């Protein structure tokens, strides 16, 4: 929603239901919705409301046959993450570890398709069946948990996942924490390829500390 719809107090569920009855929307076409007025909170608040609304739409009334751990996967919820390179790194790390996972919001290919003359409509992304199967995962990791209070509450209370607390996988220490938590949940070892990658980062930090230690920097943009 936008501000005007929230000020008026539109009943989105009824609006969508009436549109189905009148034939504007096919009966079997999913239309999730979320309340995201811009006068409440920030972009991250809206993202949390959006994700919780989608998760609720696809799973709340379909929990009868769901069982925690049944699909052997780990769910990842990135939060309001705008740098698409981070998604690709996460995909690569999980593939190298051999971990079964679902990235429950994955705009990588949708927002970053190549300029090669080919038309790709809705390329990539998270499939609907992944979203519907999410409660069957072993657990769900929220990668920016301070942004996602509504999502955390829904996943804990409805999906019955533990949602362990972790820091955003950024930098050496927090990426270590992330990978070790994934290893603990999945039972998969962290491969030598990622250990070597970590070692190169430590080597780079050691080599450059003479020039960077104690220095202040400013970031713009």
Go through the PLM ranges and name each one.
Residues 1-221:
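An N-terminal assembly and electron-transfer interface module characteristic of large anaerobic redox
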